[in-house]
Amino acid sequence: MSKLFSDRNRPIHMGRFPTERLMRSLLCPDLKALAPWPMLGFQRPAGSRSIVPAMAEFQAMMDAVRDGPTNSVISEIPADLQERSNHLKAFAYFNDIAMVGVTDLTVDDYLSSPRLNPEVGRLAHALSTRQTKTLAAGIDMIMADLKESMAAKPGPITHHTGALVFLVDYRRDPRPDEPGCDWVQDAQAERAALLGAETATVLANYLRVLGFNARAHSATTSDVELSRLAVKAGLAQVEGDQLSHPWLGRRFGLAAVTTDMPLAYDQPLASVQPKSALKSLDWILGRHGGASRNNHDPYAVRDYVSGAHPFETLKRVEYPTTYMDEPNIARVPKRTDMFARAQFGDMGPQVQKGATGGHYVRKAAPSAAQRRLLGAFVLLQDGEPAQELQRISPEKAGENIKGASYFLGIDATGLSRCPEWSWYSHDARGTPIIPPHHHAISMIVDQGFETMEGASGDDW
């Protein structure tokens, strides 16, 4: 179901869900009987076709860079604590987190034994032998920082005073016989963990860029009890020994960031919610302009393989409408792209200075925060295929690729041939490229409208 109301007047920090309609309590419920948040692993039995093991290395990378050096100079930020919390919430909502809460951090919130992702150690060993092939500005600094983070032992965070807690809602469970869903069966918790860790890792780095100490905590690596923090931050209620949300039930994942930045805290949810909150028009119809009971999950009424948008209504043609003289299209080296040319000074010293060390990215704190994780992911862009080839028909492979990409949050996926002229002739190091693949998977992400760039047409 599409949106019926506009959200143009809804502040970004309030998020998609009408959480302001939920009743709050001045007192926190008893948390003694609350079960710990489950420790999550990304392993599957040998021979499984699940996508979850392929996600493990990315989760480990985020767990590896969840902490890092803090800027020695504290940036100028709002003195009003509520304004600070609103800014950080808006950042998380811009990254598509479902709900965000802020709470204080007490000694009871720490785990007696911190959880550590066992994949981080294996990843550290693998990275010591991998080489990057990119000329991305400042990649040398990113790699040095990454190796330092891998080698460093996490210190105590008892000086942290508050926590930002992130809730990631589950999508519909794929049907066992659903086309395109062979790879994503029983992967809801891992999907939520991956998406939550992404925002937590970036936001923790953002706080460190601003000069405040911060550390991310995920379902696989954490120093704090996520269940307790979720209740205190007003993201969940206590139901027996489990967590529950008035609208989502138990279908969500959690991540958090602890920090020493002073913030304004949210109140816990009341144990009993009024009917006006559970059956309000804001929740049922989305009158507030955001997510509603009927549209918060686009796949409630669509198969994953079809995507969230009605692509089936678009007209298709056999060949592109733009003419391409394929036999005469020249292949050019990677060195000719504008980022490489800027670094080598082809466009003058001023542009070269802006590209040095990735300054054009680092000059904005949010971009600098995102850049660290993006640079770390560069090392995971390639890898060795499994020795055993799994037989799968082209039609089924195409369906599974689309189904998996949409399940993980991509907005549009297309499959096509990948002709030789679409490849660079040489990589960033000058090594000739012999095209190894003849097929391409193209994916685009909706950039949204919250920034001027997205609102001015560069929205994908």
Specify the residue positions occupied by each region the protein language model found.
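Iron-sulfur (Fe-S) cluster-binding modules
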Residues: M1-T129, H159-T161, A270-R417, H437
